[in-house]
Amino acid sequence: MNGFKNVEKAAVLSLREQVAIQEGQVVSRTLAQNDAVSVTLFAFDKGEEISSHRSGGDAMVTCLEGVGRITVDDTVYTLHEGDSIVMPAGHPHAVFGEERFKMLPVVVF
């Protein structure tokens, strides 16, 4: 099983500072990826989105900065800094940057 990557170990860090918002883009930085879990930082410019898709695992998304809109099964949720939501495995979900927005989804397979 692989551990964390793309982040300094045994050091205090700010997760939201580990990924930068870029104009007109969704930027991602994978921190861990294996058969059991996926941990990836995302940064959305205002108005950018990840269209509806499904995941094979439950995903807990935590808003690190800004305001994001999460749609799960046609229900819209708004996340502010510090808020979290669990998107159930197999259910369609999408993410939209209501404002410039950073999130940390942790997917457990």
What is the role of each PLM region?
Residues 43-45, 56-70:
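Short, conserved beta-strand element in jelly-roll/cupin
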